Amino acid sequence: MINADKPHRWNDDVQASVRLYNQWFLDAAPKAYRDTRQLTIDEVEQAFQRTANMTSITPEVLKAHPKTLATLRMSTAPPIARDRLVGLSHGSKSLLDTMEKGKLPPRMKGDVLDTHLAKMCAVLTDLLDLDLFHWYPTGEPAEPRQRELAATVVADRLCGAIADPIVRNAQERRQLALIEEWLLARGYTKKTHSASLPLNTMQPGTFSFRQNVVVGSDLPVNIPVDAVIQPHTPHSHKLPILIEAKSAGDFTNTNKRRKEEATKIHQLQLKYGNEISLTLFLCGYFNTGYLGYSAAEGLDWVWEHRIDDLEAAGA
């Protein structure tokens, strides 16, 4: 085992991990937020243009530009969460989620889609924040200063709503980049292994990121794994090393999410047997309670602040 059987080291590792995460956050998170905020400002500006400064929120606009819906939700008083808009419009959550990814559901009939969009537009128009959009009730053109202020407020709301994912995604990219750098320095090659091929046929000395791994027998499904590594000298069972990159900015969130990896390792072992393992790559606020739970579920981990433990993991 790597760290799961060494509880005497856990407290020191937790403290070191928290320090590393906090330093990264202070150094990098503001830039990640600023970069995303600029993209958000651009999205809001486009939404203003498409809706004639929020005076024409129509199904046609949403059909042509589904992703605009996220900006419109932040233009109401109060700003509306996804589920709240679904409830108020008696709509479809899957439709809303698909639209905010920039797409429309291909299998939904046209008349059904039109009905849903019309209801959404009615709710958004009724709840439009008139303290921001002074020009809406009067029918007068928006003054440049009023328009700029409204766009800034909506952009701040939208960016604030996605602040946590911004930071989490930036941290995940950084963690995978560290793993890649470590592997390349040891002669590994980055090469995708198709989910349609048996997992134990992965080429030795290769690795891939965000790879789908098949689980289940009667009803096979793909589950995503952050990093899959086949050592230069594979294990006798030929199964690669599976790694999940995990980061957390507070202790509360990790305790809420700790069952996710336990479920994943159980799915993997049902499919591939007890030989397969899932290693966590941890940075941030993972306390001894989280570690004890993970160890009891058959999980092991490598700390980012001691990345060379990947060797002990088999890489």
UniProtKB/Swiss-Prot annotation:
Source superkingdom: Bacteria
GO molecular-function terms, A-Z: DNA binding; type II site-specific deoxyribonuclease activity
Keyword Nuclease: yes
GO biological process, one term: DNA restriction-modification system
Keywords from the named record: Endonuclease, Hydrolase, Nuclease, Restriction system
Catalytic reaction list: Endonucleolytic cleavage of DNA to give specific double-stranded fragments with terminal 5'-phosphates
This protein's record includes keyword Transferase: no
InterPro entries given in the database record: Restrct_endonuc_II_XamI
E.C. number: 3.1.21.4
Positions of disulphide bridges: none
Designated name of the protein: Type II restriction enzyme SalI
UniProt source species: Streptomyces albus G
